[in-house]
């Protein structure tokens, strides 16, 4: 399938024309271009647009039948729902803040606490004193994290091993809810260095911004990269629709796909790069959207019902985001992997039953349908977003280093302090394309 401007800024437009022509060639023919870009998510689209602006010819391929990667605004329930990325994190320096304005998509200040929250334990309300202890526990957890860096890295579980009970309790929802992984697996040093700052939310969907941003980028969808051969002076990408030859490649596929060796490399990647991939992993943060008619169960728009204790801490129900008749359930770690294996019907039914335990049988009566976004079972992602394993806080920076001036990796996994975000993915795609352009210029 091909797409030029139908789905979901050039400084030298004349020089960009060869890029448009090259990218439009059928993949079954051998393409001779400056760079082949693998993956049309935020990083790949940013790389392609930067290549256009720099006068670098390119071919952009994408295995899915759409662009956007792990940004996905679903409209099947009658309203826009982000099944993937939701927040424009560190919005004061995130490129998507400006891009949203450029493509005409509204953003608003907001975060997950903007509508308030109620805390539960296995569906039962948590007493006020316990809830207060949980909040103070989060403060204690952040204080402990400040003393950790790459030289003394530990997991969240190890960090709080001798801490007060409320701090121990706070570590579980932070790891499972924010990273999407079990606390014993996540590097504190890596997570603690990520950018902080104001968030913005997108009523029409983050995915809508990315769709519009990529609307004019030539891309071949439904094309699977199988092998990247970098044994010669350039690269040869073997796909299910023929080979693509280029002077360099930008690889933007998620870490989950790289670790599963869905894309192979010939020769094998250098040890430093291979170790970097090994040092990263994918969390399983996922979502389920539930549509209701009429009853709001006494919850205000944007309120969160948070499961802090009990068997499954770290999951929450986002009630009526943007005052719409939808509840979005957020859940991660091994619990998410378990639920995602149920498939859409089973996963939706499970979360509806959990909500019924909190708000009562009225939810069952008002329910009108649901959608499941189980990223750990998505073959093109195999997870929600990346995290560093304990002792591997330097893996992201190592992965970003070019290989033999022919291979560049880009995406949220190698975005340093901007990792785990769409903004970080964009920055790395842009940086990779600029780096290649600089190397290709006559000296």
Describe each PLM feature range.
Residues 3-7, 13-443:
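FAD-dinucleotide binding site
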């Amino acid at each position: 399938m091909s797409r030029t401007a139908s789905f979901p800024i050039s400084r030298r437009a004349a020089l960009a024309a060869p890029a448009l022509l090259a990218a439009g060639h059928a993949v079954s023919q051998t393409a001779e271009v400056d760079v082949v870009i693998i993956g049309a998510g935020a990083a790949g689209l940013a790389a392609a647009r930067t290549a256009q602006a720099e006068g670098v010819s390119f071919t952009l391929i994408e295995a899915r039948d759409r662009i956007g990667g792990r940004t996905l605004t679903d409209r099947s329930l009658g309203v826009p729902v982000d099944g993937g990325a939701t927040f424009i994190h560190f919005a004061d320096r995130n490129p998507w803040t400006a891009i949203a304005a450029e493509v005409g998509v509204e953003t608003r200040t907001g975060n997950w606490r903007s509508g308030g929250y109620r805390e539960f334990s296995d569906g039962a309300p948590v007493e006020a004193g316990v809830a207060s202890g949980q909040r103070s526990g989060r403060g204690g957890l952040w204080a402990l994290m400040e003393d950790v860096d790459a030289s003394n890295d530990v997991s969240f579980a190890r960090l709080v091993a001798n801490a007060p009970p409320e701090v121990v309790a706070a570590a579980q929802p932070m790891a499972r809810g924010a990273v999407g992984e079990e606390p014993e697996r996540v590097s504190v040093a890596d997570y603690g260095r990520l950018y902080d700052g104001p968030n913005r939310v997108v009523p029409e969907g983050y995915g809508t911004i990315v769709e519009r941003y990529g609307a004019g980028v030539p891309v071949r969808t439904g094309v699977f990269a199988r092998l990247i051969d970098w044994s010669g002076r350039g690269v040869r990408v073997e796909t299910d629709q023929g080979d693509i030859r280029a002077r360099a490649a930008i690889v933007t596929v998620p870490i989950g796909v790289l670790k599963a060796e869905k894309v192979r490399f010939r020769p094998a990647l250098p040890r430093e790069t291979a170790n970097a991939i090994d040092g990263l992993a994918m969390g399983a943060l996922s979502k389920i959207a539930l549509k209701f008619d009429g009853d709001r169960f006494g919850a205000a728009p944007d309120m969160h019902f948070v499961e802090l204790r009990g068997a499954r801490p770290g999951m929450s129900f986002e009630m009526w985001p943007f005052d719409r008749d939808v509840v979005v359930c957020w859940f991660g770690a091994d619990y998410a992997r378990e639920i995602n294996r149920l498939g859409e019907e089973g996963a939706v039914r499970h979360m509806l039953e959990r909500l019924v335990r909190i708000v009562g049988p009225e939810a069952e009566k008002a329910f009108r349908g649901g959608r499941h976004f189980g990223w750990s079972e998505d073959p093109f992602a195999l997870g929600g977003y990346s995290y560093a394993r304990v002792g591997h806080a330097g893996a992201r920076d190592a992965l970003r280093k070019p290989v033999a001036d022919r291979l560049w990796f880009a995406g949220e996994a190698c975005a340093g302090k901007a990792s785990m975000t769409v903004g970080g993915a964009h920055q790395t795609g842009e940086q990779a394309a600029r780096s290649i352009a600089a190397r290709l210029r006559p000296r």
